[in-house]
C-alpha cells in the first residue's frame, strides 16, 4: 500500500467533504479511493472516517491522524519543490486576503510594488471583511484584525488600530458634542453591521481603566460597507463608529471629528498570518519580508496624523 497516496486521499476527503470529490480531483476511480482509505484504516487498526449518505465525519483517531498527515504532506511537498529548484527564485501564484478598506488603502499599494519587484509571481488579492479560513480556502497570507485564537496559524505583528466614534463638524455644531457614551442614545447613529442586535449598542471603556461599558445607540441609518458609513457621516447623517484607518483621511482633512476618545476600547492588533510551520515557500517568505515593514510604516504614519478630537 502506498501510504502517502492513501494519506493524501484521506486529507483531501476531509477538506472536500466527499470521496467523490477526491475521485474527481485526483482522477482516480471512486472504488479505488474508498479501498485505499479502508486499507489505511486496516493498516492502522482503527476507524478514521464515519461515512454517511450526506457527509464524512472524522473519528477522534481520524482527527489526530489527519492533523499529523497534513504536516507530513506539506513537508513532502516542500522537499519536492526544493529539489525542483523552486527556491532558487520566487515564482508561482500567491493568494492574499485583507479587510476591504485596509486592503485598498494599504495592502494594494504594497502588492503593486511587490509585483513590479517579482515578475514571476502572480497574486490573487481577496478583499473581504470576513475572516477567510486560510487552509480551507487555499489562502497563503492574510491580514487579520483582532486576537488570534488558532495556534496552527503563524502571526507577524504589524501594529494596532482603534475603534473610534466620529461625526461631521456640521453635525456636532447642530447637535452638540456628546460628553459620555450614554449621550449617544439621544443622537442619530450610523451602523454598517446588518447583523447587529435588535437593540444595538456600542462597546466603550471606562476612562483610565480596562472596565468595559456598553452604551445603547439609536441607529438612524444602517449600511453594508464602511465606506458608505464614512460618506454618510461626512454628509451629517449621524454619528458613526468605525476603525481608525477607515476614517483617517476624512479626519485628517477635517471632514470628520473624533469624539469620546477617552472612552475608546483597547486597540486591536493587526497581524499578517500564514498557515503551517517550518520552511515557507519562497514566494510566501518573499511577500512576508517585503510587505511587513511597509505595512508597519504605513500604519505608523497613519497614527502620527490622527486628526484632532472634537470638544
Where are the model-predicted features located?
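Secondary-structure junction motif
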Residues: 188-210
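C-terminal effector-binding regulatory domain of bacterial HTH transcription factors
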Residues: 67, 245-253, 263-311
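A short LG(V/I)-centered, amphipathic sequence patch enriched
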Residues: 41-58, 256
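Short helix-boundary/capping micro-motifs
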Residues: 12-27
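Hydrophobic hinge/microswitch elements
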Residues: 214-258, 265, 274, 288
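Alpha-helical linker/hinge and terminal dimerization helices associated
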Residues: 7, 43-44, 65-87, 301
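Flexible hinge/capping segments at coil-to-helix
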Residues: 152-163, 167-192
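Central regulatory/effector-binding core of bacterial HTH transcription factors
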Residues: 92-155, 304-311
Amino acid at each position: 500500500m502506498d501510504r502517502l497516496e492513501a494519506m493524501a486521499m484521506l486529507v483531501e476527503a476531509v477538506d472536500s467533504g466527499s470521496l467523490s470529490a477526491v475521485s474527481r480531483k485526483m482522477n482516480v476511480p471512486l472504488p479505488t479511493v474508498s479501498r485505499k482509505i479502508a486499507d489505511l484504516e486496516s493498516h492502522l487498526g482503527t476507524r478514521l472516517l464515519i461515512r454517511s449518505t450526506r457527509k464524512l465525519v472524522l473519528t477522534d483517531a481520524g482527527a489526530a491522524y489527519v492533523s499529523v498527515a497534513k504536516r507530513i504532506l506539506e513537508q513532502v511537498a516542500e522537499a519536492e519543490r526544493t529539489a525542483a529548484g523552486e527556491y532558487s527564485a520566487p515564482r508561482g501564484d500567491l493568494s492574499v486576503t485583507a479587510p476591504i478598506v485596509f486592503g485598498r488603502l494599504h495592502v494594494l499599494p504594497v502588492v503593486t510594488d511587490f509585483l513590479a519587484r517579482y515578475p514571476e509571481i502572480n497574486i490573487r488579492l481577496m478583499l473581504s471583511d470576513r475572516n477567510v479560513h486560510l487552509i480551507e480556502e487555499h489562502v497563503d497570507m492574510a491580514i487579520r484584525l483582532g486576537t488570534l485564537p488558532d495556534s496552527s496559524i503563524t502571526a507577524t505583528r504589524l501594529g494596532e488600530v482603534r475603534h473610534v466614534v466620529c461625526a461631521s463638524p456640521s453635525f456636532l455644531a447642530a447637535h452638540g458634542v456628546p460628553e459620555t457614551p450614554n449621550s449617544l442614545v439621544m443622537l442619530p447613529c450610523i451602523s454598517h453591521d446588518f447583523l447587529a442586535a435588535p437593540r444595538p449598542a456600542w462597546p466603550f471603556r471606562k476612562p483610565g481603566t480596562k472596565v468595559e461599558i456598553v452604551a445603547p445607540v439609536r441607529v438612524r441609518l444602517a449600511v453594508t460597507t464602511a465606506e458608505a458609513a464614512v460618506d454618510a457621516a461626512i454628509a451629517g447623517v449621524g454619528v458613526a463608529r468605525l476603525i481608525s484607518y477607515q476614517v483617517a483621511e476624512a479626519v485628517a482633512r477635517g471632514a470628520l471629528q473624533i469624539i469620546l476618545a477617552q472612552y475608546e476600547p483597547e486597540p486591536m492588533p493587526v497581524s499578517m498570518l500564514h498557515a503551517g510551520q517550518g520552511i515557507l515557500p519562497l514566494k510566501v517568505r518573499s511577500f512576508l519580508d517585503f510587505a511587513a515593514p511597509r505595512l508597519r510604516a504605513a500604519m505608523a504614519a497613519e497614527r502620527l496624523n490622527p486628526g484632532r478630537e472634537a470638544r
